[in-house]
Regions:
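Thiol-based oxidoreductase modules, predominantly thioredoxin-like and allied folds used
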Residues: 2-4, 23, 35, 42, ...
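Local sequence-structure signature of Cys/Sec-based thiol-disulfide redox active-site neighborhoods
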Residues: 8-43
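Short hydrophobic/charged patches on amphipathic alpha-helices used for structural packing
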Residues: 9-10, 62-65
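Core residues of folded domains in eukaryotic genome-function proteins
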Residues: 17-19, 48, 72-75
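Structural signal for hydrophobic/aromatic residues that build the beta-strand cores
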Residues: 20-21, 38, 52, 76-78, ...
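Short aromatic-centered micro-motifs
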Residues: 27, 49, 78
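A short glycine-leucine-enriched loop at secondary-structure breakpoints
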Residues: 66-71
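Non-catalytic, surface beta->alpha helical segment in thiol-disulfide oxidoreductase systems
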Residues: 72, 77-112
Length: 112
């Protein structure tokens, strides 16, 4: 799974493939809990599977915070043809879980 830097997003967005990006921060305990779930899914999900990416947005200066209106981490955003087709924002005090990932994958696969 690729770790996207801000300057690599345009290449990812210009791809015709569906992409699922997890935005996270190393200091976030909910991200540390969710990251293995995301990685396991990236390694096992096969049906019309989107390409999985992660993007570490530790720094407040990272332009992706504002560009994608990220207010909590982890946040998972699904893209197709450069457009956002679905997203899940981390819930305060909870983060994201396996059911959140499963629901965004289902939505991503049904978006055609």
């Amino acid at each position: 799974m690729d770790n996207l830097q801000p300057d690599q997003f345009e290449d990812m967005l210009s791809s015709k493939e569906k992409a699922l990006v997890m935005f996270y921060a190393d200091w976030c305990p909910y991200c540390r809990k969710f990251k293995p779930i995301f990685e396991a899914s990236a390694n096992s999900y096969t049906d019309d599977r989107p390409k999985f990416f992660q993007s570490n947005i530790d720094s407040d200066e990272n332009p992706l915070w504002e560009k994608y209106s990220i207010i909590a981490v982890p946040t998972v955003i699904a893209f197709e043809n450069g457009n956002i087709i679905s997203r899940r924002d981390g819930k305060m005090g909870i983060g994201l879980g396996k059911s959140d990932l499963e629901s965004i994958l289902k939505e991503t696969n049904s978006a055609r």
